[in-house]
Amino acid sequence: DLIMNSQLIWNLDAQFVFLGAGEARYERALLTLAKARPQHVGVQLDFTDRLEHRLMAGADMFLMPSQYEPCGLTQMRAQRYGSLPIGRRVGGIADTVHDDTTGFLFDEFRPAALDWCISRALTRFADPDAWAMRMDTAMQQDFGWERSAERYAQVYLQAIEIAKSRR
């Protein structure tokens, strides 16, 4: 409902590609929009990893207006390609996207909040040098296991020290 009720998305002179299957009512609505605005809306219901990667590689922004997102790897992959996520500040998106640096975040699950966030992103996009800097920062994010393992090791060592001090 968030995307379908957005005033900004459907009136922008921009292109949107929707990939993957979902609830039948949303699929029908998106396919109807794609027929009405073929130069602006593309819909591909059959998801493939290859197509996802190609879309990310060619996109300037990656829309992720999740109502909830327990982890989310998609925004991390998008950042690797320099496709800046526009997402709701929830779960894994909130943990991995830095607002106005490696992507753009909004809080309320309302179309007006999504529109505001897209508008902010488009304002930043209008400055090519600043946008390139954001893309570069996003592509340099380190979500690898080596860094995570080091952080876990630090937490375990701290826990051991605390346990020793309580003896």
Question: Where is each model-derived feature located?
Answer:
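A charged, aromatic-enriched C-terminal amphipathic alpha-helix characteristic of glycosyltransferases
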Residues: A126-Q154
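Nucleotide-activated donor-binding/catalytic signature segment of Leloir-type glycosyltransferases, i.e.
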Residues: W10-R54
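Acidic donor-binding loop of glycosyltransferase active sites
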Residues: A57-P70
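Short glycine/acidic-rich beta->alpha loop that forms part of the nucleotide-sugar donor binding site
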Residues: E69-G72, Q79
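Short hydrophobic beta-strand element within catalytic cores of glycosyltransferases
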Residues: L84-R88
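Short glycine/serine-rich donor-binding loops of glycosyltransferases
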Residues: G72-Q75, I93
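Short acidic alpha-helix that forms the nucleotide-activated donor recognition element
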Residues: D49-G58, H98, A113-D115
